[in-house]
Amino acid sequence: VSPTADWKPYKTQKTNIGAAQSICKAVLAQPNPDDIKVCYIGTVAETGDRNYPIHWGRCGDPIKISIYDHYAISKTVAERTFVESGIKNWVVMRQSGILYPNILKNMDPIMFHVPINGVLEWCTVEDSGRLMCNLVLEDEAGNLGSDFWNHFYNIGSGKEYRISNYEFECLLLGTLGLAGPEKLFEPNWFITKNFHGQFYADGDKLENYLHFREN
């Protein structure tokens, strides 16, 4: 995943695409492949740059990968691998940025590869884990019918987690007792495009099925 994927693009392609191919092959090789259900986690990066005024997105929007984003390329090809594999019941969930306690320790140049006026609907690490748990439990209970499977969904923690990158930088720096980004960084240190991030117009669809938002 990013940011390691930016440093090792060829290994990223081999890992993400190869893993998808291996999983599909293993499922289809079982004596009961039609009984096996598969969930693949995609990424918001597949739809690329979505700065204002096209900052609201949904599954079904054109795939538009940012230049040099090998991670998004690998995830898109892997996603297609599952969809076209012949597996009877698959679901694709596209993950957003994950909020987790140690996010401040992730020091990498990617912090400047984010448009300061861009947006993102984040998902907490707790909601992400709850999503996977509830997927298993709801399916086991027979609550997920054919209207759920063989579709794409966006993963987000909802309207409370829709925020501009500028606001996010202010919050992060504020936890360290520092001033806003305009006091610490030069504006031209940040890119103005060629990244990814959006608010989800269809984000509630997955919540209505799996009820994972609690943060």
Give each language-model segment a name.
Residues 18-68:
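Conserved Rossmann-fold NAD(P)-dependent oxidoreductase catalytic core, especially the SDR/UDP-sugar
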